[in-house]
Amino acid sequence: MVLIVFGLVVLRGFEQGDIKPLFLATPTPTRTFNSYAQEGEVHFKVGNLKKAIESYQMATTLDPNNADLWAELARIQVYSSAMKSTDAEKLAALQAGLASADKAVEVAPGSSNAHAFRAFVLDWNANPSLVGAEEAQKMLTRAEQEALAALQIDPANGLAMAFYAEISTDQLKMDQAQRYIAMAMEAAPEQMDVHRIQGYVWETLRQYSLAIQEYKLAVDIMPNMTFIYISIGKIYRHLQLWPQAMDYFAKAASINQQIGVNDPIPYLALANTYTQQGFFREASMNMQKALSLDPGNPDVYAQLGIVYQRARNYEGAIPAFECALRGCDAVKSCEVRMCDDANNPAITLPGLPLSDNTVVYYYTYGSVLSGLHKQGDNYCVQAVQVFDEIRAKYGDDEAIMRIVNVGMDICGNT
C-alpha cells in the first residue's frame, strides 16, 4: 500500500513538473537582448556592420519596446549604406534604417535620442539621386523637425546638435551648421559621429586640411570605420595627393580583409585613383579584385567599363558595359571577370536602371558603341537605343545632351 501511494505521488510530481526525469540534457541558457546588444556593439566597433545589424535585430526581437536598441540599429543600418555601391543597395539600407528609427520614436516618443537618430536617418535618406529632388527636400525638412524635437526634449544632447549641424550643412545653412557643430564638440567630443560631422562641415566649406584632421580624429575613436578612410582618401585624391589617397584606400581594404568583410569599395577607389593618374594596368587589376569580391554587382562591371574606356580598350569596355546596363548570363559575366569556369560561381546579372548615378555609364557606353561602329555591325543600332533612353530622361541637361549628340552624329542620327 505504501509503495502504491509513493508511486502515485511520484507520477503526480512528473505531471506537474516538480520532479524531473533522470538524464535529461542540461537546458541551453537563453540569450538575453542585452547579450545581443553587447555583441552588436562589439561588431560595430570592429567595423563589421553586417554582423552588428544582425545582432541588434536579434536584440530588438527579444526587447521590441527598447528605443535605444532601435535607434542604434538605425544608426548602423544607415552607416552601412556608405559601404554599398549600387543605388538599390544604398536605398535598401537607408530605408531599413528609417523603419528602425521610426520604431524607436514610436516606442519612446519622449526620447531625445530616438528623435536625434531619426533626424540623422532622414537626412541620409534625403538623397536626390535616390529619392528625387522633391522627396529629398521633404525629408530634409522632416529631419530638421526631428533634430529640433530632440533638442527641445534635451537641450544638452550632443549627438542631436551634431546631427542638426549635418542637416544644416545639407541645407547649405553653413553659419548654423558651424554654430551647432561647435556646440556638439563641447558637449560630446568623445563621439565618433561628432568628429565625422565636423569633418563633413569643413569639407563642404572646402577647408580640406581641417576636414582631414577631424576625419582622422573620428577613426581614432573607431579605427575600423572604413567609409571614413574612404572619405579621407577622396579628399587627398581631390587635392591630387596621390600617395596619401592610395594609402587610405589601402588601409580600408586591409581592415576589411582583417575582419572578413568582402567590400569592393576600397578597390574601386584605388582603381579610380590609378585611372586618374593614367595607370590603367593597375586600375584594371584593382577593378578585377573588386569584381572577385562582389561578382554579382553590376555597378562594378560598369566601373570596369569606365577604366577600359579611359585606357582606350574599347573592345573590353563593351562587354563590361553590356553586363552592367543590359544584364548578362553566366558565360558573359565570366568573360568580363576573366574567370576559368562560368559555373564557379554562375553569376547572372540584372541591368542597372538609368539614374543620376548611372547616366555617366550609359552615355559612355553609347559613345563607345558609336565610336567603334563599322559598316555591317549593329553597334550604332545599340548606341541609338542607349542615346534615346538618355534623351527621354535627360533631354534638358545641356552637358549630357552634347555628349549624346556627338554619338548620334557619328551614327548619322540627329
Feature map (PLM): residue ranges:
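Alpha-helical segment of the N-proximal tetratricopeptide repeat
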Residues: R31-L62, Y79-K90, L159, F163
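Structural marker of alpha-solenoid helical repeat scaffolds
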Residues: L62, V107, I153, A187, ...
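Register position in tetratricopeptide repeats
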Residues: K45, Y79-S80, W124-N125, D170-Q171, ...
